[in-house]
Each structure stands twice: as structure tokens, then as C-alpha cells.
Swiss-Prot record:
Residues 183-212 form the CBM10 domain. Pathway: Glycan degradation; xylan degradation. Residues 27-128 form the CBM2 domain. Residues 281-607 form the GH10 domain. InterPro entries: CBD2 (IPR001919), CBM10 (IPR009031), CBM10/Dockerin_dom (IPR002883), CBM10_sf (IPR036601), CBM2/CBM3_carb-bd_dom_sf (IPR008965), CBM2_carb-bd_dom_sf (IPR012291), CBM2_CS (IPR018366), GH10 (IPR044846). Its EC number is 3.2.1.8. It comes from Cellvibrio japonicus (strain Ueda107) (Pseudomonas fluorescens subsp. cellulosa). This is Endo-1,4-beta-xylanase A.
Length: 611
């Protein structure tokens, strides 16, 4: 079973382990190898290196060799060679504390043979766990059962699996760090201290770190450890309750954010996930490089959704799986008190499709199954919930090929290859088999209008329920305007889904509220200049009321045990896909261009607080 720390490092491992000679003294590790998903021509697998010694391992390398199989891709390691192969750690996963693990993954071409399981070599591996394999469409039980189901349990699990750290292990800090031999004992788990970041969490040397001031602000016995500090890592930290840990993390994170006046955070006002979509593909809004946005996420939210990098095409490099970018984001989430809502396993736009998803592919169904099996299994235990299928219903406003409706369904490449909507059933069944613990959602837009598309949604969900398909919830994207649709229709649309099953969850997945309505035929109402609502305008006041009434409707219509959460589709206005829409500026989110909370933010606070 993998430790919580292994997951936070972004796991899925490789084959064969040997560590650099200068770190070998008094260090032992077990190296376990698994085939996680196998198909006719290849497979994906992983190996995990677990430090069983008493001192930290600081830097590792691995090597292995096949008979006929050949490596086609890998992630979370630097790989070289063409059989034999060698791999070494990246900058962020080279340090393995006692009792902790790191791992990286691979995809292999069988080259006409069977799946090989080469010997695990290397002097660091004192014990090699026998190789195991998972047949096609299955997932290792160690992956499926080892994951915490909430932020709190993730933190507790991480603390429970961390051994008390000796001075020798503390001394092995990252090379190049001006922190010397010091690290941060963050509620029972060791993290690097930041060099340049002065508040909160940072991203330096390709990994997360904690600012000295934030680390030192924790209550005893936590804080800075190592040379110059006598604060130990106490094994008793595992006895902390989940509520006290989450409360402490929120308190510390909130105090580091200069852009949020309340200091409490939206997530502290709800007993269900309050999430936000984050960009992770470069630019000013990139969560990895914008410390101000990181502060907002830590202070306000407890769940993130990737805007793009967990969509279908982003899981590949050419025809091979590649999880490096998505693993980095999932790791960041785990290290920053966030769960992850995966978006999305299946989505139709041509610009978001992998190479295999075409009408001409004779092996389409096999590749479809391999995609669901591999991606869902890879993130098993790390992703709390998935949009399994996104936007499978027809919408006249989004029909670029002019194919029209097929009994309410979009005639996507998936629909065409399967000859109907059964691909939806298949996707849910395979996702459940690959990750039994994740919540599985169907997600779509304009379904809150309570019109024909809402009826199509009801029919789709009812069909899935009748067929025993393992659907856990329905996502309403909720891209709305200040004046459309009516709150009465939003309520009725959600109520129709609530009525379908006593266990079905409802999640608002992509909430934003436009001030301008380009469809109302009255341009005199439009705000046309970027400065019109930069600070204040009547539209911002209406937007506050709109956010408030939507959250209130959600709380009143959806029973407490069936609230999957509310996610806002972006952190600040300039991050939004609607910042300029149909030649009009807009201000659709909770924070403005200066990353300050808007009236809309207060509207959400009031709704969650019952005011």
C-alpha cells in the first residue's frame, strides 16, 4: 500500500531501482513493481521505492532491461537509454524520508511478445516485492483502496505514515537550498522551506515549499526543524483530529493571503466542497507561478478543477500516455489542502481529442476502453470525483458540424463509433472498475434553463439509473447571466434531478455570472468598456444578488447529504474564458483584476452563512 506522501508526490512508478552510491550507506528500500493496465499490444505499469531505512534518501537512479518489450513513454522521472534503460529523480521527488515512498510510471510496447516483468536491480533495494499484474480493465487493489476520501483524512494519513524524524534525516535537505539543514514540519509532514517566498506556500526548484513565517506560525510541536531549531517531528501528531488539522491549515493559509479581508475562507462556511478552476498551462493565471492566486486558493477553497490539463488530449504525448503535467497539479493540490475534481474523462471537441479518437480508427472501442481504464486507474485515490462524460447532449448553440440531435444526444465521434449513447454507460462502468472510490458525474451546460435540454438530461440520467450504470451525481455547469435564466427555472431544473434518485448528488461545476447579455437584443444595457465595472457599477450589485440566489437555491433544493459541491470557473475576472465574449468585456468571477474580492464574493458568503 502506498503512503499518503507517495500520493502527494504524484505517483505511478517504474521498473528497477538503484540509488546513487554516495547515499547508499545505512539506507535500504523496497522496490515493488506492478502492471496496472494491460491490452493486446502494450501495458502501463509502475514501481514504488519505499525508504525502509533510518535516514533520508537524497537522490535516486534506476535501471532495467527487457527481452522484447520496449519503453514507449514515462512520467515523473528522467529516463535515458534504449534498452537497457536508466532513470533518475526529478528535482521535486528525489528526497525520500524514512517510511515514505516515491514512484514514477511508464508505458511499454510488447513488440509482439507478452508483458515482461524484469528483475528489480540496484543496491538500494534491500527487498524487491514480487511483480504483480492487473488484467485489462482492472485496477490494483492497493491503488483502489489506499486513498483518503477527504482533505482531512489525507492529512491524517500522511501524518500517520510519517515516522519521527531523526537529526540525520532532517540534515538531508535539497541541494542548493539556502535553508541549510532546516525543513518545515507541517502538521507532522516534512516539506522544504522556501528560499524566496516570504508568505504562505510557494513553488521553488520545481516543487512546493513553505515560507519560514508560515511554518513558524504553527502551534507546537510543529514548525522549523533541523540545525538552529530544536522542534522535533512528533509522532503524536497522528492523534490530531481531522477537524483540528483542517482548521489549523485554513487558519494558517488564510493569514498568508493579503487579498482576502475576512481571513475565514468560503470553504469554512460549507460542509461540502467549495472549489475553483485553476489554469496550469502558463500565462499570468498559472497556479504554479502566481503566488497571489495560490494564496487565494489556499485561503478560500478546498477543491480544485483543472481548466484544461486533465482533459483527454492532455493525457498524451503523441500516441503515448503522459501524466507529468497533471501529476504535478494533483501533487500541488495534495500539498495545499485541496481535493481534486477531475475534468474530464470523455469530451467531444476536435481540438481536445487524442489522436486515436477519429471516425477512421478501426480500434476505436479498444482505445476508448484503454483511455478510461488507464487514466482513471492512474489517478485512483488521488482524485475525489470525475466528470466522466462531459456535454454528451445536443445543443443547437454548439453544433459546429451541423449534425443535429439524435434523440437529444450530440452526434459526437463517440456517439458515431458506438452507434448510440452506450459509450456513456461504458465510460461510467470502466471508471468505477478502475477507481471504486471516486464520485462519478455526468456534466453539461444550459441544463439549468429548465427547457428541452433539461428534459434530455432527465431522460439520460433515468436511462443510466434503469440500466444499473454507476452514476453518482449530475453536474450543472451554471454558466449564467445576471438576468438569465430565471432563478425559478434554475430551481426547477435541479429539483428534477433530485427527484430521480434518493442518492444522486448535485454539483455546480463551472459557475460564473456574466454582467452583459449579448442575446437580449438591447445593446443599450451593455457595459462596453473595460473600466465600466473595474471598481463599481450597478451590474456588480446585481451580480452579487445573482450569486447569492444561486447558492441559496442550491442549499434549499439539494438535501445536505447530496451536495457534491460548488465550483467557480476561475479565480479572478482576467482568468475567465468570458473576460471578453462576443466583443464585449465582462467581469464574471468573485475576484477582480487586482485579485480583490468583489461584491459577488460577499454574496456567496451571505448565502453560505444563511444571511
Amino acid at each position: 500500500m502506498r503512503t499518503a506522501m507517495a500520493k502527494s508526490l504524484g505517483a505511478a512508478a517504474f521498473l528497477g531501482a538503484a540509488l546513487f552510491a554516495h547515499t547508499l550507506a545505512a539506507q535500504t528500500a523496497t522496490c515493488s513493481y506492478n502492471i496496472t493496465n494491460e491490452w493486446n499490444t502494450g501495458y502501463t505499469g509502475d514501481i514504488t521505492i519505499t525508504n525502509r531505512g533510518s535516514s533520508a534518501i537524497n537522490g535516486w537512479s534506476v535501471n532495467w532491461q527487457y527481452a522484447t518489450n520496449r519503453l514507449s513513454s514515462s512520467w515523473n522521472a528522467n529516463v535515458s537509454g534504449s534498452n537497457p534503460y536508466s532513470a533518475s529523480n526529478l528535482s521535486w521527488n528525489g528526497n525520500i524520508q524514512p517510511g515514505q515512498s516515491v514512484s514514477f510510471g511508464f508505458q511499454v510496447n510488447k513488440n509482439g511478445g507478452s508483458a515482461e516483468r524484469p528483475s528489480v536491480g540496484g543496491s538500494i533495494c534491500s527487498g524487491s516485492v514480487a511483480s504483480s499484474s492487473a488484467p485489462a480493465s482492472s485496477v490494483p487493489s492497493s491503488i483502489a483502496s489506499s486513498s483518503p476520501s477527504s482533505v482531512a483524512s489525507s492529512v491524517i494519513s500522511s501524518m500517520a505514515s510519517s515516522s519521527p524524524v531523526s537529526s540525520s534525516s532532517v540534515a538531508s535537505s535539497t541541494p542548493g537550498s539556502s535553508s541549510g539543514n532546516q525543513q518545515c514540519n507541517w502538521y507532522g509532514t516534512l516539506y522544504p522551506l522556501c528560499v524566496t517566498t516570504t508568505n504562505g506556500w510557494g513553488w521553488e526548484d520545481q516543487r512546493s515549499c513553505i515560507a519560514r513565517s508560515t511554518c513558524a506560525a504553527q502551534p507546537a510541536p510543529f514548525g522549523i526543524v533541523g540545525s538552529g531549531s530544536s522542534t522535533p517531528v512528533s509522532s503524536s501528531s497522528s492523534s490530531l483530529s481531522s477537524s483540528s488539522v483542517v482548521s489549523s491549515i485554513r487558519s494558517s493559509s488564510s493569514s498568508s493571503s493579503s487579498s482576502v479581508a475576512t481571513g475565514n475562507g468560503l470553504a469554512s462556511l460549507a460542509d461540502f466542497p467549495i472549489g475553483v478552476a485553476v489554469a496550469a498551462s502558463g500565462g499570468n493565471a498559472d497556479i504554479f507561478t502566481s503566488s497571489a492566486r495560490q494564496n487565494i486558493v489556499r485561503a478560500e477553497f478546498n477543491q480544485i478543477t483543472a481548466e484544461n490539463i486533465m482533459k483527454m488530449s492532455y493525457m498524451y504525448s503523441g500516441s503515448n500516455f503522459s501524466f507529468t503535467n497533471s501529476d504535478r497539479l494533483v501533487s500541488w493540490a495534495a500539498q495545499n489542502g485541496q481535493t481534486v475534481h477531475g475534468h474530464a474523462l470523455v469530451w467531444h471537441p476536435s481540438y481536445q481529442l487524442p489522436n486515436w479518437a477519429s471516425d477512421s480508427n478501426a480500434n476505436f472501442r479498444q482505445d476508448f476502453a484503454r483511455h478510461i481504464d488507464t487514466v482513471a486507474a492512474h489517478f485512483a485515490g488521488q482524485v475525489k470525483s470525475w466528470d466522466v462524460v462531459n456535454e454528451a447532449l445536443f445543443d443547437s448553440a454548439d453544433d459546429p458540424d451541423g449534425r443535429g440531435s439524435a434523440n437529444g444526444y450530440r452526434q459526437s465521434v463517440f456517439y458515431r463509433q458506438f452507434g448510440g449513447p452506450e459509450y456513456i454507460d461504458e465510460a461510467f462502468r470502466r471508471a468505477r472498475a478502475a477507481d471504486p472510490t471516486a464520485e462519478l458525474y455526468y456534466n453539461d451546460f444550459n441544463t439549468e434553463e429548465n427547457g428541452a435540454k433539461t428534459t434530455a438530461l432527465v431522460n439520460l440520467v433515468q436511462r443510466l439509473l434503469n440500466n444499473g450504470v454507476p452514476i453518482d451525481g449530475v453536474g450543472f455547469q451554471m454558466h449564467v447571466m445576471n438576468d438569465y435564466p430565471s432563478i425559478a427555472n434554475i430551481r426547477q431544473a435541479m429539483q428534477k434531478i433530485v427527484a430521480l434518485s434518493p442518492t444522486l448528488k448535485i454539483k455546480i461545476t463551472e459557475l460564473d455570472v456574466r454582467l452583459n447579455n449579448p442575446y437580449d437584443g438591447n445593446s443599450s444595457n451593455d457595459y462596453t468598456n473595460r473600466n465600466d465595472c473595474a471598481v463599481s457599477c450597478a451590474g456588480l450589485d446585481r451580480q452579487k444578488a445573482r450569486y447569492k440566489e444561486i447558492v441559496q437555491a442550491y442549499l434549499e433544493v439539494v438535501p445536505p447529504g447530496r451536495r457534491g459541491g460548488i465550483t467557480v470557473w476561475g479565480i479572478a475576472d482576467p482568468d475567465s474564458w468570458l473576460y471578453t465574449h462576443q466583443n464585449l468585456p465582462d467581469w464574471p468571477l468573485l475576484f477582480n483584476d487586482n485579485l480583490q474580492p468583489k461584491p459577488a464574493y460577499q454574496g456567496v458568503v451571505e448565502a453560505l452563512s444563511g444571511r
